[in-house]
């Protein structure tokens, strides 16, 4: 039996007499260690009982230390065993893709989806930047328009409405005419004898105006017998202006000015019509009384 333990790599001697070799066999495993084996050991009749117990305790401590050393792994050590080294991983991947072609298609679809996703993200970013830029431009333009409107309308609000004093008389528009146009108009108005020179036209106009003034004066005073004096004054004025005596005497004859209505307007004020109407009424009453008296006498 001792030979079998020697072949297994345990040192010679009894297996119970070498606690260190037992710890080496069970290195990396948790074995229960206790001092309860001391009564069993005393049965063999060993002399150094205390030394054996100490050796056994030291072996248990060595076993625990070797177990914890097995748990503490160096991070720099390779996790893969020697047959599966890093150099063999690409070869295994290529063999896996050859055996399963759908995996290659899956990787291709994943790459295309990733590229499409990147493209969509770029488009989204660019569109977002464009929207923000447009919003900034719009806000700046709106602020400029508001500033322009405020500058445009602010003076108008500050200005007070000007109070215009209305003139009591209506404004008459003076018509601008040339002197030649006025003379032509006068020629058409007062040129019954075909006179076209300026002096004769002006004289005709002046005389016609004087005649109208005299007629208005005579008609406004019907009770006064001033017809003769007016005619004499008019004839004297005409004789002083003109040199043709015979013609003026004929024109200034009293027979010419008896009918004033033949020379122009016959104006009569309303106040002068009342005595005429009263006289006519009294004459009518007198005629009625006369007729009635005649009928009574018959």
From Swiss-Prot:
It is found in: Nucleus. GO terms for cellular component: nucleus. Residues 129-140 have a biased composition (Polar residues). Signal peptide: none annotated. InterPro entries: bHLH95_bHLH, bHLH_dom, HLH_DNA-bd_sf, IND-like. Differentiating root endodermis. Residues 117-149 form a coiled coil. SUPFAM superfamilies: HLH, helix-loop-helix DNA-binding domain (SSF47459). Residues 163-212 form the bHLH domain. It holds the Pfam family HLH. One of its GO terms (molecular function) is DNA binding. Homodimer. This is Transcription factor bHLH114. It comes from Arabidopsis thaliana (Mouse-ear cress). The lineage of its organism: Eukaryota, Viridiplantae, Streptophyta, Embryophyta, Tracheophyta.
């Amino acid at each position: 039996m001792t030979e079998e333990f020697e072949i297994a790599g345990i040192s010679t001697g009894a297996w119970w007499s070498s606690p260190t070799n037992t710890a080496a066999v069970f290195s990396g495993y948790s074995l229960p260690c206790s001092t309860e084996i001391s009564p069993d050991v005393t049965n063999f009749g060993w002399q150094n009982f205390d030394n054996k117990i100490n050796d056994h305790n030291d072996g248990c401590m060595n076993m625990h230390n070797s177990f914890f050393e097995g748990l503490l792994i160096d991070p720099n050590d390779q996790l893969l065993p020697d047959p599966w080294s890093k150099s063999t991983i690409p070869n295994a991947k290529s063999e896996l893709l050859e055996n399963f072609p759908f995996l290659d298609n899956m990787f291709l679809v994943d790459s295309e989806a990733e590229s499409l996703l990147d493209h969509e993200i770029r488009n989204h970013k660019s569109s977002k930047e464009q929207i923000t830029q447009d919003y900034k431009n719009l806000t700046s333009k709106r602020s400029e328009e508001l500033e322009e409107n405020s500058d445009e309308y602010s003076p108008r609000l500050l200005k007070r409405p000007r109070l215009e004093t209305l003139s009591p008389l209506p404004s008459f528009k003076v018509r601008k005419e040339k002197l030649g146009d006025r003379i032509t108009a006068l020629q058409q108005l007062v040129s019954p004898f075909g006179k076209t020179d300026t002096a004769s036209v002006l004289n005709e106009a002046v005389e016609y105006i004087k005649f109208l003034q005299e007629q208005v004066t005579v008609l406004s005073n019907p009770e006064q017998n001033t017809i003769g004096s007016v005619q004499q004054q008019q004839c004297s004025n005409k004789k002083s202006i003109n040199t043709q005596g015979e013609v003026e005497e004929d024109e200034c004859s009293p027979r010419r000015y008896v009918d004033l209505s033949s020379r122009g307007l016959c104006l009569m004020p309303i106040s002068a019509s009342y005595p005429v109407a009263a006289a006519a009424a009294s004459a009518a009453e007198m005629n009625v009384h006369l007729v009635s008296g005649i009928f009574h006498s018959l």
